[in-house]
Amino acid sequence: MGFRDLDIKKSYISCGEENIAKSFLVPTLKQARLYQRSVGFFSSSVFEPIIDGIVALARNDGRIQLVASPQLSEEDVNAINLGYQKREDIITNAFSRDFISGIDALDDAKLKLLATLIAKGTLDIKIAVTETAGIYHDKLGILEDVVGDVVVFYGSANASLNGYQNNYEKIRVVKSWVDAESESIQDEQEEFRALWEGTNPFVKVYDYRESAKTNILQILANRQTESEAKPNDPIVLRDYQEEAIAAWVANGYHGKRHISLSKHYS
């Protein structure tokens, strides 16, 4: 089964029963092996309405590549312009503020799932800003299924819970197996590839995967008892933790898997 077996419409809105998440993203993610998303704003609350699709994609040995912009404060921009601090550190810290706020609201099961996706390379995140410290504001999504068919969507929706089901947002969808739409899909794929690989001359991207993993593990550690992990200790995945995660993945993301967090350096 692939995208052609789905009743994919030309557009979706974020309201009602047939909203972006329920009627479009979850069904397509379940058939996908690659999900590429670039947005001006990302919140980890987005995982709530599409979690079933993400788990199915992971079972397909799929990958998610996410590019988003940080919400830079006036102080952040001034610090960058005046050279008070390393540009990458300021941008990463700004992105982390929103990232941590969002993931801290997730329950332990979803938080561990997110940690698993990042640790195993299923989910990779990069931060994008313009060379003048402006935000990257394009909103593009690309999905590829197991037979190579591609669906592209674009529109006003950011990658957030509000963007997918609370605000009034609209996306438009094009399909690679429709002759009149195939050329525009190739253009969007090239656009995303340049962004992801850092060859877009107007946008600078920074890796965030390791920072994301560290922030998630720190939150998990903070939720454990004092005897298991102290809140201020640096947290890293040990070999046996990687093995535990791998076993959980191999079991189809089922079962209660307690991931022990060591306070020791590896």
Give the location of each predicted region.
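PLD/PLD-like phosphodiesterase catalytic module centered on the HKD motif
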Residues: 1-247, 253
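Walker A/P-loop
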Residues: 39, 252-266
